[in-house]
Amino acid sequence: MAHTYLVPYDGSDNAKKALNWAIDYAKLTKARLEVLNIQPSFKTVHAKTLFNKQDIEEYQCQLFNECTTGVEDALKNSGAEYSLQMGVGDPKEVLVETVKASRETANPIDLIIMGSRGTNPFFGGVLGSVSYAMINSGVCPVMIIPQEK
């Protein structure tokens, strides 16, 4: 049975490095990659008052497309089997739920490969809040790709 690796991708330099590492590792291990970009839900009183559901969904898709520009080409060129998807919500919760849901599929996620820090400058020192949460979730092994020094 082939392995499946989940790669959270937020467009940060660390996420790009982790994706490149995951692509190389998937080629070596003949694994499948699931690249997941997670957009905010915008479920606030102000957002619901000012925007309708369709506007919010269109904006999330726009952010997804901007963030993942070039990702699909890199995945196609890798020769690895892959999927590129968008999730919506809190990244920690979406990642845990994605791993758990995959257990009921033909391609359960064996490993999360992610950068040590993402795009949020307010949380985390050496290790970002999402990376830290994934390690502590215990849903599956996590490989952290360190940021450039």
Across the structure, where does each feature detected by a protein language model lie?
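A short acidic, glycine-rich active-site loop
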Residues: 52-66
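General small-molecule cofactor/ligand-binding pocket signal
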Residues: 36, 83-87, 143
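Histidine-centered beta-alpha loop that forms part of the nucleotide-sugar donor binding/catalytic region
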Residues: 10, 89, 116-119, 147-148
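Structural beta-alpha unit
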Residues: 73-112, 149
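Glycine-rich, Arg-bearing micro-motifs that act as flexible, cationic patches
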Residues: 111-133, 137
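Small/aliphatic-rich secondary-structure junction motif
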Residues: 3-53, 78
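Intrinsically disordered or low-complexity boundary/linker segments at protein termini
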Residues: 1-17, 78, 106-110, 137-149
